[in-house]
């Protein structure tokens, strides 16, 4: 697949056919994804390939806690789980909010689920002393996760990067035997997408790009 086509058509697939994703194809996908950049080329990623139905169901169930709050905040017009604005919904509202099936069922029903982790001993968390949530470590793991989706798209498969289960990271670590110094970064269901989107909606360049300064004129169209 031509690169620009892949960039414009790799969507978040959450519904899959019954077609398997064979080990040899998955190995090819990971073989391409490993060429992602990482700080110092330390390549701190680790991947757990999950096919066992019970384990996939457990990972889906672990996504429900964060998914419930996500849905409650979204229904209240909030940006869910952001660290700037405190949630305006109370605990009781969150507790009685049903979890939208699309947030958890893909993990339980996908042919394969990848649990992507990163070694915290090798990533540079340069923003660790700032008075905000740390995000810089993600530069050494999420390009790898995105490469997985691009390579899967090239091979005729799809998936998505989900993070809801990470709110229950201790339980995931216990379930999968993950060492303490690793962080769980994503739970990625993969398979043959039940449908394909060819027209993704994104903001135009001029809405997010400025010249020279934050308050500079728009760049692009």
Functional labels for PLM-detected ranges:
Residues 41-44, 108-110, 183:
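Short, basic and Ser/Thr-rich N-terminal targeting/leader segments
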Residues 49-140:
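Glycine/small-residue-rich phosphate/adenosyl-binding loop
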Residues 6, 12-13, 84-85, 183-221:
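C-terminal helix-cap and adjacent tail motif
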Residues 35-41:
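Glycine-rich phosphate/pyrophosphate-binding beta-alpha loops
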Residues 29, 33, 114-174:
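Small-aliphatic-rich amphipathic alpha-helix that forms the alpha element of a beta-alpha
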Residues 1-24, 28:
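Short acidic N-proximal helix/loop "leader" segments that mark the beginning
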Residues 65-68, 174-190:
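Short, conserved aromatic-histidine micro-motifs
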Residues 15-16, 46, 158-162:
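Short catalytic-loop micro-motif centered on adjacent basic/acidic residues
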């Amino acid at each position: 697949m031509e690169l620009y086509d892949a960039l414009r058509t790799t969507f978040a697939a959450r519904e899959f056919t019954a077609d398997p994703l064979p080990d040899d194809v998955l190995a090819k996908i990971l073989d391409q994804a490993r060429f992602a950049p990482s700080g110092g080329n330390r390549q701190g990623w680790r991947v757990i390939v999950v096919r066992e139905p019970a384990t996939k169901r457990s990972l889906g169930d672990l996504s429900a806690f964060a998914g419930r709050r996500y849905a409650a905040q979204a229904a209240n017009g909030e940006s869910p789980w952001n660290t700037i604005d405190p949630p305006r919904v109370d605990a009781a509202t969150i507790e009685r909010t049903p979890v939208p099936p699309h947030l958890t069922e893909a993990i339980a029903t996908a042919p394969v689920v990848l649990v992507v982790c990163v070694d915290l001993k090798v990533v540079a968390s340069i923003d660790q002393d700032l008075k905000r949530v740390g995000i810089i470590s993600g530069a050494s793991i999420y390009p790898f996760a995105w490469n997985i989706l691009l390579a899967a798209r090239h091979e005729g498969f799809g998936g998505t990067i989900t993070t809801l289960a990470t709110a229950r990271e201790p339980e995931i670590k216990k379930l999968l035997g993950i060492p303490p110094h690793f962080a769980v970064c994503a739970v990625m269901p993969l398979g043959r997408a039940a449908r394909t989107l060819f027209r993704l909606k994104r903001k135009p360049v001029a809405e997010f790009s400025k010249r020279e300064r934050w308050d500079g004129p728009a760049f692009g169209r």
